[in-house]
């Protein structure tokens, strides 16, 4: 907060009561919105630090873009801590381990440019893993790029993101 006091995040609250937790985004997974649910940093631009914090937490599922913020040493430490890592929707993973999926170096491609993995596909993976907890789960799912299409005044971009969001809501 503004007094430099650490405030418990939503994911920390959920984990404290035994819920499973997840983050899903079409931006970098360390971007402002997903970061605000799980990290303690002074600036949204501290994406390397956010990745380090995520790697040292017990988040059950993390799916999105941003591999460039996870150096090999951090990925190896994360995997060695008992988690699984995928970088393609076609990769196999152990359903009993925490899962990190980073599908691009930066944000995922816009929906209208045929991104490799849809928001709905990521949500299906996350929910299927998280839903096994009898105490419930919290997952933040963000269709991150609707805003970006608006900034660019790009109707195709906005339409693709809205259609992707509609598919997610229909799921």
Give residue spans per PLM region.
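Short, hydrophobic/amphipathic alpha-helical packing segments
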Residues: 4-8, 120-124, 162-170
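Active-site His/acidic residue clusters
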Residues: 32-37, 107-114, 132-171
């Amino acid at each position: 907060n503004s007094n430099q006091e650490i405030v418990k995040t939503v994911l920390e609250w959920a984990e404290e009561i035994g819920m499973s937790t997840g983050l899903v985004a079409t931006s970098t997974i360390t971007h402002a919105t997903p970061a605000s649910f799980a990290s303690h940093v002074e600036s949204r631009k501290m994406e390397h630090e956010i990745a380090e914090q995520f790697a040292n937490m017990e988040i059950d599922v993390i799916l999105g873009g941003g591999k460039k913020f996870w150096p090999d040493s951090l990925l190896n430490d994360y995997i060695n801590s008992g988690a699984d890592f995928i970088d393609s929707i076609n990769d196999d993973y152990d359903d009993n381990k925490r899962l990190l999926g980073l599908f691009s170096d930066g944000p995922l491609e816009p929906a209208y440019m045929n991104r490799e993995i849809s928001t709905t596909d990521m949500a299906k993976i996350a929910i299927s893993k998280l839903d096994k907890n009898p105490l419930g789960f919290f997952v933040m799912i963000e269709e991150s790029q609707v805003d970006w299409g608006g900034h660019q005044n790009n109707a195709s971009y906005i339409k693709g993101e809205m259609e992707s969001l509609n598919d997610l809501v229909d799921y």
